[in-house]
UniProtKB/Swiss-Prot annotation:
<feature type="binding site">
    <location>
        <position position="44"/>
    </location>
    <ligand>
        <name>pyruvate</name>
    </ligand>
</feature>
<comment type="function">
    <text>Catalyzes the condensation of (S)-aspartate-beta-semialdehyde [(S)-ASA] and pyruvate to 4-hydroxy-tetrahydrodipicolinate (HTPA).</text>
</comment>
<dbReference type="InterPro" id="IPR002220">
    <property type="entry name" value="DapA-like"/>
</dbReference>
<dbReference type="GO" id="GO:0009089">
    <property type="term" value="P:lysine biosynthetic process via diaminopimelate"/>
</dbReference>
<comment type="pathway">
    <text>Amino-acid biosynthesis; L-lysine biosynthesis via DAP pathway; (S)-tetrahydrodipicolinate from L-aspartate: step 3/4.</text>
</comment>
<keyword id="KW-0963">Cytoplasm</keyword>
<dbReference type="Pfam" id="PF00701">
    <property type="entry name" value="DHDPS"/>
</dbReference>
<protein>
    <recommendedName>
        <fullName>4-hydroxy-tetrahydrodipicolinate synthase</fullName>
        <ecNumber>4.3.3.7</ecNumber>
    </recommendedName>
</protein>
<dbReference type="GO" id="GO:0019877">
    <property type="term" value="P:diaminopimelate biosynthetic process"/>
</dbReference>
<feature type="site" description="Part of a proton relay during catalysis">
    <location>
        <position position="106"/>
    </location>
</feature>
<keyword id="KW-0456">Lyase</keyword>
<dbReference type="InterPro" id="IPR020625">
    <property type="entry name" value="Schiff_base-form_aldolases_AS"/>
</dbReference>
<comment type="similarity">
    <text>Belongs to the DapA family.</text>
</comment>
<keyword id="KW-0457">Lysine biosynthesis</keyword>
<feature type="binding site">
    <location>
        <position position="202"/>
    </location>
    <ligand>
        <name>pyruvate</name>
    </ligand>
</feature>
<keyword id="KW-0220">Diaminopimelate biosynthesis</keyword>
<dbReference type="InterPro" id="IPR013785">
    <property type="entry name" value="Aldolase_TIM"/>
</dbReference>
Length: 291
């Protein structure tokens, strides 16, 4: 387990594949700038538009480059239980430290089916599992009562909670906060979730402000709560601008503006609207990230 900031890393693409040279640079940059853990092939990494072979290669490559300096978390969950198991087994084989398993989307399963999905994956592997709750994308919510039940599975050790509902997070902490680590899945709720006993954040903002996102968490853990809150508020407008369109469109655009060679988005994601690009650029300039 880790405490602090886990970057939900973008995947740098070429026109027809993954830019591994740039991926290596990004991994090293994050380690240098005190990112506490690295998630690959997640939502921000455009995992849904990567082929199975691309995902396997990115996971393997990232594990090898990072070489245990920080934990590497592999986004292996899909709405297909069998496919999720296959990729999770592969991540375990190549040395990933944890897998991130999203709630199954589109299928519209029941709570019984949701539990069966996670239970089947849990029983098939021997690697820690971080659940991913993001109802706005999946149409499926992990309720506090369901999390309390899932926390009894031996490999389920954490949840990325992106419902945006702090009352729900509080109930989760009350029911099973002693058995499962809760990470904020929203950059505007890092400090509120830390105040409920959270362990950190899985962050989009960390793609462009790795050390600063780490510091929000670190200062809180050191008891410097006001300083942590002030950093949260300092970067709030910038964080919000990264969601002015569907993630990861703005953050990948921002990184290219910052002279990272992250390449194109993959369809059906496309370039930002001009009016939103102006807002993003203004926020990047205000924080000294571009001129």
């Amino acid at each position: 387990m880790f405490k602090g900031s886990c970057v939900a890393l973008i995947t740098p693409f070429t026109e027809d594949g993954v830019n591994y040279e740039e991926l290596r640079k990004l991994l090293e940059w994050h380690i240098k700038n005190h990112t506490d853990a690295i998630l690959v092939c997640g939502t921000t990494g455009e995992g849904s538009t990567m082929t199975l072979e691309e995902k396997k290669e990115v996971i393997k490559f990232s594990v090898e480059v990072v070489n245990k300096r920080v934990p590497v978390i592999a986004g292996t969950g899909t709405n297909n239980t069998k496919a999720s198991i296959e990729l999770s087994k592969y991540a375990e084989e190549v040395g990933a430290d944890m897998v991130l398993i999203i709630t199954p989307y589109y299928n519209k399963t029941s709570q019984k089916g949701l539990y069966a999905h996670f239970s089947a994956i849990n029983d098939a592997i021997n690697i820690p599992i971080m659940l991913y709750n993001v109802p706005s994308r999946t149409g499926m919510n992990i309720t506090p009562l369901m999390l309390d039940k899932l926390a009894n599975l031996n490999n389920v050790v954490a949840i990325k909670e992106a419902s945006g509902d702090l009352s729900q997070v509080a109930k989760m902490a009350e029911l099973c906060g002693d058995r499962i680590a809760i990470y904020s899945g929203n950059d505007d709720q890092i400090v509120p979730i830390l105040s409920l006993g959270g362990a950190g954040v899985v962050s989009v903002l960390a793609n462009i402000l790795p050390e600063e996102t780490h510091n929000i968490c670190e200062k809180y853990f050191l008891g410097e709560v006001i300083e942590s809150r002030n950093l949260q508020l300092k970067y709030l407008s910038l964080a919000n601008s990264l969601f002015i369109e569907t993630n990861p469109i703005p953050v990948k655009t921002a990184m290219n503006l910052m002279n990272f060679n992250c390449g194109p988005l993959r369809l059906p994601l496309c370039e930002m609207e001009d009016s939103n690009l102006v807002i993003l650029e203004e926020n990047l300039k205000a924080n000294g990230l571009i001129k």
